């Protein structure tokens, strides 16, 4: 069974050394409206852009690349 992007990102929460990806994971965890069941790049990207959760979408792109590599 494939992990959703949200499920994948939860392993980055409470990282020993904070970085932009661990900060994104924390923000996703705190956002009750985040599309937790989605595996769709466009859906998640649009949500993040509209929510203003990130200063730069390159953080999401980096996290998404790691997610794809891990699948």
UniProtKB/Swiss-Prot annotation:
Pfam name, any one: YozE_SAM_like
Family per record: Belongs to the UPF0346 family.
Gene3D superfamilies: YozE SAM-like
Full protein name: UPF0346 protein BC_2253
Cited InterPro entries: UPF0346, YozE_SAM-like, YozE_SAM-like_sf
Organism: Bacillus cereus (strain ATCC 14579 / DSM 31 / CCUG 7414 / JCM 2152 / NBRC 15305 / NCIMB 9373 / NCTC 2599 / NRRL B-3711)
